[in-house]
Amino acid sequence: GNGHLLFQLLEDINEEYEGDKTFEYTGIDYSPDSVKFASGVAKRKYSELKVNFEQVDLLQESCSFLQNKFDILLDKGTLDAIALNQESLADFNGKIGMDVYASQVEKMMVQGSILLITSCNFTKDELIKIITKDTNLEVWDEINYPSFQFGGVKGSTVVSIAFVRN
């Protein structure tokens, strides 16, 4: 995407963190244009920080980027976008992207890594099922948003769940 979430995170950490540890920030997107845009913003506004953007296709089995390991991974709409395409993937024996997303992301995690997903397309239960099926990920925490009730069902317009890798 445009890197907004990553930029907000690094600004907040720089304001709040008082230790001497340095952090590296990496943003990924499928679109080369999005990566170019976010890289330009990073260069103009955050040149003193370790910020990198890469064009990555998570749905390629041979994606070498997945060899990288991260402590925290944030997804704000990636799974939602992947789920819109219901075409089968040749690399994954005809499975659809939504069904391989979690196992692909898990490759970038070590024990104790956190994956925070924000979705406007899935319910809490649906998201938990998608992410925990066939992975070593389990629910760690969630963000509670204001909810509403419609047709006897209570819900919210957005769901954010943090998963930890065991």
Give the location of each predicted region.
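A short acidic, Gly/Pro-enriched loop at the edge of an enzyme's catalytic core
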Residues: 59-74
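Conserved SAM-binding loop of SAM-dependent methyltransferases across substrates and taxa
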Residues: 2-21
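A short glycine-rich, Lys/Arg-flanked "PGG" loop and its adjoining helix->strand segment in the class I
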Residues: 88-111
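Conserved SAM/SAH-binding beta-strand->alpha-helix loop
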Residues: 31-33
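A short beta-strand submotif of the Rossmann-like class I SAM-dependent methyltransferase core
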Residues: 75-79, 84
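Conserved SAM-binding loop
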Residues: 38-39
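Conserved SAM-binding motif I beta-strand of class I
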Residues: 24-29
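Class I S-adenosyl-L-methionine
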Residues: 124-166
